[in-house]
Amino acid sequence: WKARPGQKGRQPGLPKAGRSFPVMYRDNTFIRAGRNSVKLKVRIRNTWDWVDVELDKHDVDYIALHCAARNELSPALRKRGKKWYLDFSFEEKVILKKVSLDTQLVLGVDLGINNACVCSVMDSKGTIIGRRFKKLPVEQDSLERALRRIRKAQSNGAKRTPRLWARANGVNQDIAVKTANFIAGVANEFKVDVIVMEHLDLAGRKRGSKRQRLHHWRAKSVQKMVEHKAHRCGIRIRRVC
């Protein structure tokens, strides 16, 4: 921009702060001051200084109840909306099951658009032991209504509809969470050793009458949540084409 002032360009500036910041390393920028309080080292009043932060009692009790046997990692400072949050991560070591092929129980999962999922449990000989279906008609209707409102607003000339999109994304996330919880529940019910899911390639342009529903289909998000839940229970994950 200095060598060629006639061309487009401007002077580079400092990067703007985003919504996710680096990890607050322990004893460097993060100190446990008590059970319900911590100290964070942040840049305030043109200097680096320690700030006392009080933790929510309900969050502390939840961590003490469900994460007592896990290793607490360094937290991360993130901004959601107009508020700042301190996100804690926990590490847990799990040994996956080692079962011979003759005695393995496999859970096959078929994710769909109309039905949330179909789960089939079979043994090594191919005998179907159990089958479960998951339908979410109320959530699907809510998603359809949210998408119709977005289409109507866009046809009337509205370029940005953040509230309508927030509603649709929230319903879509709820569908993904309920589907993943159902699959994990079926796996624990039948004590399966492996969960098999289809490798879905959702790249490219969507065509057809259901292209909008296919575009908002969060199949990979469901598979990721199922993978985390299965590994915590010692269950292996396989994907087939």
Protein language model annotation of sequence segments:
Residues 1-80:
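Acidic carboxylate diad motif detector
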